[in-house]
Amino acid sequence: MRRFPSIKARRMLRILRSNPLNYIASRNSRGSHLMLVSHGRQPILFYYHPKVEISGRIVREMLVEKAGLTEEQAWNLIH
């Protein structure tokens, strides 16, 4: 298992919204809490504070466990 780097929340949101993930915020999102949905993937509840660092463990959890990517695909998205 790879050790994923911590990244800024703004960058993580950009990754989740880009290809191949294509997550979008659902209409009932409020404030800094975004419910991100994508066809064929689990929804992700994202706490968006743009300058906050997201730990590598959470980055891996979002991309591998929630979004359904392999570790290799997730690693390539963030590098």
Which sequence ranges carry the predicted segments?
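N-terminal first-folded block
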Residues: M1-N28
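Short amphipathic alpha-helix initiation/capping segments at coil-to-helix junctions
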Residues: P5, K51-V52
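General helical structural elements
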Residues: S6, R14-I15, L34, E61-V64
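Short acidic/glycine-enriched loop/turn segments that link adjacent beta-strands
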Residues: S29-H33
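Active-site beta-strand termini and strand-to-loop segments that position acidic
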Residues: L36-G40
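Short, charged/polar, Gly/Pro-enriched secondary-structure boundary elements
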Residues: R41-L45
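C-terminal structural segments of small proteins and small subunits
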Residues: V52-H79
